[in-house]
UniProtKB/Swiss-Prot annotation:
Name of the encoding gene: leuS
Keyword Cytoplasm: yes
Residues given in the record as ATP binding sites: 622
InterPro entries given in the database record: aa-tRNA-synth_I_CS, aa-tRNA-synth_Ia, Leu-tRNA-ligase, Leu_tRNA-synth_edit, M/V/L/I-tRNA-synth_anticd-bd, Methionyl/Leucyl_tRNA_Synth, Rossmann-like_a/b/a_fold, tRNAsynth_Ia_anticodon-bd
Protein name from the UniProt record: Leucine--tRNA ligase
Record's keyword terms, sorted: Aminoacyl-tRNA synthetase, ATP-binding, Cytoplasm, Ligase, Nucleotide-binding, Protein biosynthesis
Matches recorded under SUPFAM superfamilies: Anticodon-binding domain of a subclass of class I aminoacyl-tRNA synthetases, Nucleotidylyl transferase, ValRS/IleRS/LeuRS editing domain
Pfam families in UniProt: Anticodon_1, tRNA-synt_1, tRNA-synt_1_2, tRNA-synt_1g
Amino acid sequence: MQEQYRPEDIEPQVQLHWQEKQTFKVTEDNSKEKYYCLSMLPYPSGRLHMGHVRNYTIGDVISRYQRMLGKNVLQPIGWDAFGLPAEGAAVKNNTAPAPWTYANIEYMKGQLKTLGFGYDWDREVTTCTPEYYHWEQWFFTKLYEKGLVYKKTSSVNWCPHDLTVLANEQVVDGCCWRCDSKVERKEIPQWFIKITDYAEELLSDLETLEEWPEQVKTMQRNWIGRSEGVEITFDVADSQEKLTVYTTRPDTFLGATYVAIAAGHPLAKQAAENNPELVAFIDECRNTKVAEADMATMEKKGMATGMFAIHSLTKEKVAIWVANFVLMEYGTGAVMAVPGHDQRDWEFATKYNLPIKAVILDNEGNEPNVHEAPVTDKNILFNSGEFSGLNHEAGFNAIANKLVEMGVGKRKVNYRLRDWGVSRQRYWGAPIPMATLENGTVVPVPADQLPVILPEDVKMDGITSPIKADPEWAKTTINGQPALRETDTFDTFMESSWYYARYTCPDYDKGLLDPAAANYWLPVDQYIGGIEHAIMHLMYFRFFHKLMRDASLVNSNEPAKRLLCQGMVLADAFYYIGKNGEKIWVSPADTIVERDDKGRIVKATDKEGHELVYTGMSKMSKSKNNGIDPQLMVEKYGADTVRLFMMFAAPPELTLEWQESSVEGANRFLKRVWRLVYEHSSKGATQPLDITNLTVEQKDLFRDLHKTIAKVTDDVGRRQAFNTAIAAVMELMNKLTRAPQETEQDRALMQEALLAVVRMLSPITPHACFIMWQALGGEGGIDTADWPQANEQAMVDDTKLVVIQVNGKVRGRVTVPADATKEYVHDLAAQEYGVAKYLEGVTIRKVIYVPGKLLNLVVG
């Protein structure tokens, strides 16, 4: 061990050792408890960012800790390699997506290795390789055969810039989540997987995920959106047509005064045949904002169709309107409007001067003035004929039953969740394994013709997918008949929905999964990723697992037992106004700042002298140019320091503020540990510690050591509060640096303490701990060392500090043996000057003793 801590010397040396010894390679071993720790796989964008580093450091710390508990730990890594960014980069760099992607993977793989992550690299998967997507295509054809896949023309969210379909979740404020272009509505044929068949199970099984964040489960519950209600059929006046609506409030049915239908509803099309104004309005609706958040806040617009529905109970005519807030994709494409008891319906009725009727009393039990505001609470019914006087639940059931008896109603459970549209009109994705025969029949590509390989040597024009532009690529033969291949590719969420299972058997060539390997490792014990994936990836991830279970590929119901959603990494952001009024963002690395006495930034300039506006801490991003390159930090401080800072700066689920001064602090701490280990080990071997023959000071330090082990074990294992675990080790280190080293027992105790400190830090700072363990003469290598065990007896205090009160007021404190009697403590307390003066000339009427904590003398 060298005297100075130089990570640039030791880290490559330790990483080479891991590589040569294949330290983290694992196989199935039924004699050991397994532990599968997984961080969400990265997209190979070109360089790691600090968000990656935080995610993967958390995963590596958990994995290394579990190894030290003696478990058979799988920690794999791979690449979510398909996707739009590769197409944009290929056009920009005049190349194809494949070489750009593979080059990025190689570079980022090197970055991961320099950070010391303990991956089993033999299990690496790259989702854009035929070896991977072969089995995805095969599974899709099996789902098709089971009736879980279908194709239909549907109205979709269309990004005119990326020329592709967006899921509702990918529309943010009416714009594309990726490029911010305004989203349009478009009718195109799409492939869908029936996730709605699993809606109830996806919802109910959330209850079994006890170690998932409640926030994620709530987001999924809301997205699935289960509701119980009634489907009501109206007759259309002067027509043979019927109109069906779904409502969760049948108790308000007597207050329905109009019906709103979607622009794509058959009745809307029928009404528009001789109405050019309605045609124009329907066209406007097709390009309206489509995300649900937008639906809630946008201006409500409508137009009368001139048609009327017949109210099923009152037989009154209610007008049918086309409204921009009703979508064909949700429910029946029509809603009954009760403006007296629904805010949206009320706004619409007020705007267009439609009737508003009250049928629910207000919270005080009075008849409300619904022309001023709607009453949306579930109160007592009135003005509802035979149903007046019923409460919400009774009214719901009575009206529902009546409609069912009349044959115009049907109780129904509805879900907000829509089927998963998996078609994308881009090139860089896995080809959808379907084909169309000359007679128009659509068939799956047979298993012996899979995979349908995506050509990688292509020219990108940035507009048309190369496989759509090349008519020859689509030509194929299915069972001897000419056919045309599907030229759409899979949504990239397909690849990331099952990669975790493929890690268990990455080289298996007889099917999607090797059931023996998959069922040894699955479910994942610990999954780590951002909260932003709660309702897309994490929903599809759960859905795919259930599909694989029902195909007898896995035995478990859920893919992951425990989920940790790490917070974002924030950094200072600065800009100045350019010549054309635009914001020019300046990297924190290129700024000079002045701070006040509280450390707050009060002035900032860049290296060219521009005075900068400081906008505070925000998520590291390219748009604000405030990303910090992990590579530069590793080169400057070493991987262990970066890892230590990431784990210490904040609890893992909260945002982390990047402060280089704090990184320097982490580096100083590591140097302090290194120096103490060096000084201790350079004095030679120590004798075994005799715990039966310790001085009072040695006992105190021994007790502190084992209390620290207990706390760190709980913080890392159960609480995942890594920052407080590190703080506890730092506190112990402060005591160790002050501990006397005069006797053999002193040195033996220091040896035991440092062996424990190095083991507790090794999941976080593995390179330095590898070397320090060797220097201390630790048994075997640190990579096979056991986690230190807390000695329960050692943690018991020999003495207690007892608070002394007189008439309930604190007057002193005394240190007593842990087993001291009330009489002993009383006698000792009476001799304390601070207590004794309050006992002069008074009578002690009562003595209250809480053993080891408090003595209260009641005097009078």
